[in-house]
């Protein structure tokens, strides 16, 4: 096209081309015609070749189309299967969701019905309780009106009897052994056993009357072991002595006191309890009327009659020999030692009582031996000026056990010597009917054994 344009320009133009340009243009035209001829020839050859190969190409094309159609059909069938499976899964899922929805609605309906039924029952119970309360109030008001009418008419008033079912329930329960022995139970009103509160007793109990800083701080030992450094056992015992000389004359002013004990237990239900036993119940009742509600050391005293009359069962025997395995958790009485061992015979139930006969005075020698043992044991305690406590026993238990074992060996050796002396001189004893020098010592080893190893007592709560 450019050549034609150039030729047209050349012929149309007013000026002629130079020979050189003219020859170049002609050469270009010849090359163009030659290329066109070659292209026409090539196209003719291709057409002829295609005509020769046309049956094979058609068959190949048809085969390819057939394979493509089969592949398309196979893919379509697979898609249909997948679609059908997906539809089935969808329908199953919808069915499960519908069933779950129905179950949820049914459950909600049941819960709502149960809640409404429960609310209805609660309303009925509340209404019944209110009705019963109104009936009781009406009965009480009727009883009060009747009592007022009787009082106005000159009648007498008395409290009504308790229900019979409560009495039957109390009879079926077993007695609490610790309340019967010590007058206190660590469970208190929650105890499953029966506490027989006496209406009259020769023993008066004042709970928590004796309090010191050391006894109050014992509750902090579990999480503050250094609290024991702020007080000493000597100070606690000195405070007990001051308390003893302060309160005992007041108790003696009411009647004859035959036992006075102050508990040094660390358990809350026994800590600082004061036990005062009078010779008669009348004196104890008089003391109750005098001291109950009275104030001492900034606290109001609450007195009660105590069932304890046998101190041998109440006092922990192992504590006296510094071998109590329960320590501060013992539920038997750990008591302070009274000055001059006062009322020491009452610790073993040896105080004289009205039912004693003249035959009981034949045991004077036994009591003298026991008293001498108490003097020997408590004399060492007075020199130490220390009140018995679990911590003190824990530090000095080993040395005291060694000394007590040596003491028992010495006593047994003396007993053997006296026995040999007794066997060597039978004629002299027959001649002289008075007891020989060995006879008081004959009872000494059993007394020593009974003092060093007291009667077995349960040391834990049932």
UniProtKB/Swiss-Prot annotation:
Keywords linked to the UniProt accession: Isopeptide bond, Metal-binding, mRNA processing, mRNA splicing, Nucleus, Phosphoprotein, Repeat, Ribonucleoprotein, RNA-binding, Spliceosome, Ubl conjugation, Zinc, Zinc-finger
Feature: compositional bias, Basic and acidic residues: 57-66, 364-379, 392-403
Modifications after synthesis and translation: Phosphorylated in the RS domain by SRPK1.
InterPro entries in the cross-refs: Nucleotide-bd_a/b_plait_sf, RBD_domain_sf, RRM_dom, RRM_dom_euk, U2AF_small, Znf_CCCH
Chain positions with Phosphoserine modification: 353, 389
Entries under PROSITE patterns matching the protein: RRM, ZF_C3H1
Annotated segments matching region Disordered: 1-22, 44-66, 115-138, 354-462
GO cellular component, one term: nucleolus
First and last residues of each zinc finger (C3H1-type): 170-198, 310-337
Compartment list: Nucleus
General function of this protein: Pre-mRNA-binding protein required for splicing of both U2- and U12-type introns. Selectively interacts with the 3'-splice site of U2- and U12-type pre-mRNAs and promotes different steps in U2 and U12 intron splicing. Recruited to U12 pre-mRNAs in an ATP-dependent manner and is required for assembly of the prespliceosome, a precursor to other spliceosomal complexes. For U2-type introns, it is selectively and specifically required for the second step of splicing.
Protein's name according to its UniProt entry: U2 small nuclear ribonucleoprotein auxiliary factor 35 kDa subunit-related protein 2
Organism per entry: Mus musculus (Mouse)
Lineage of the organism: Eukaryota, Metazoa, Chordata, Craniata, Vertebrata
Gene: Zrsr2
